[in-house]
Amino acid sequence: MSKVLIQNGTIVNEGRSFKGDLLVDGEVISEIYEGMAPRGIYDEVVDASGCFVLPGVIDDHVHFREPGLTRKADIESESRAAAYGGVTSYFEMPNTVPQTTTLEAWQEKRKLGAQKSHVNYSFFYGATNDNVDSFAQLDVHHVPGIKLFMGSSTGNMLVDKMESLQRVFLTAKQLNLPVMTHCEDTEIINRNMAEAKAKYGEDPAVEHHPEIRSVEACYESSKLAVELAKQFGTRLHIAHVTTAKELELFDNQEENLPKENLPKENLQNTDSVNLPQITGEAVIAHLVFSDADYATKKALIKCNPAIKTHADRDALRRALNDGRIATIGTDHAPHELKDKQGGCAKAASGMPMVQFSLVSMLQLVDEGVLTIERMVELMAHQPAQLFQVSKRGFLCKGYQADIVVVRPQSPWKVTKEVIQSKCQWSPMEGHEYQWQVEQTFCNGHLIYNKGAFDADYRGEELNFRS
């Protein structure tokens, strides 16, 4: 096994930043030194002077479009984009073709991950109105949880029968699986769309998207999800929270706030970990953009739920620091550029973001929105804790060496040439970042190094609750 020394960097882990060295032995972190490592013989030395050394990002929310939608993206291309962006693990969503709502489809997707993914992978199992009985046959050590669409979105996996919703929450609780929800009220959205078409024509301008997929639509659905989780005692993670009003569901609920410094060594043992029951995710687009950006970005930033007001965006940013938001994902959802033309009715919803999530959040660190230590908690520590990912998400002795080295004050501009996603566009094109990902290590392997990429490397399947 090769020994790699990452030296002279600022290590960020568990709420602290300190100058130090980190030793990787094979796939795992073998030592962390505050200050200089002892003299020794190493197969490779990475000089991280002036850089920050972080745990690899765990993105709890991506759509890599394979199988069935590979004209937009595939596991190979999007996991490559992830590696370029410092993302070393991902949880992929079930609205592919076929949908990941049968054991056969889930197993086939796992095989695709093993064959094609450049970084560590896992796949959510999707709920439908009538597939709850199959949950019990899942390998709970390899599935992050159950994905539940409580609102119709890309792929139309809507679960809209109350009896089915209740069975999903009950069965997930019995199996100790978290439920991650897409919360929008379809009846409210359909009513708003009809009104918008009557007023603005058959394809209302994209500026009206947040009026159609409204605050009310998000809040009512999220409120129902919280009620069901409380009724059955199910662990609930609400995806892509977009509104200040939804954040009220987490206000003054001490039991729902993420608990800091959970005992990492016992993550696999649910009985010994006081996991918060109800948590929320924010995604990059809703933290970076507001409805004012529709004027210039148009349908490139059309997504479901819709990007809301500047006030909503700022409320989400504040919630990063007070516990109401527990993880930051991307909802990375590529489409061909030709499908991103038009307005609310015609343009596809979703955008690629996995390559630029870390540098986007580091920009918010520079702006004083949050500290780099808190960013690491939201993008690595807490996804690992809440989903009970084994031996990842922290820079700790004995943990898998998923590591990213980032350099501040290193300006660069997003051009079409640097975009790795198969769709070859990004809403961030033309944007200048001040931070740069220099190296990405996945299981101790240097997969990305200052523009050089090892296309032959394959990541590992994530383990949960084991």
Question: PLM ranges: what are they?
Answer:
Residues L112-G126:
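A glycine-rich helix N-cap at a beta->alpha junction
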Residues D203-L224, L228-G233, L300, R318-I328, ...:
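His/Asp/Glu-enriched, well-ordered alpha-helical/loop segment
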Residues K72-S79, N129-L138:
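Short, acidic/polar
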Residues M1-P55:
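Histidine-rich, glycine-flanked metal-binding segment
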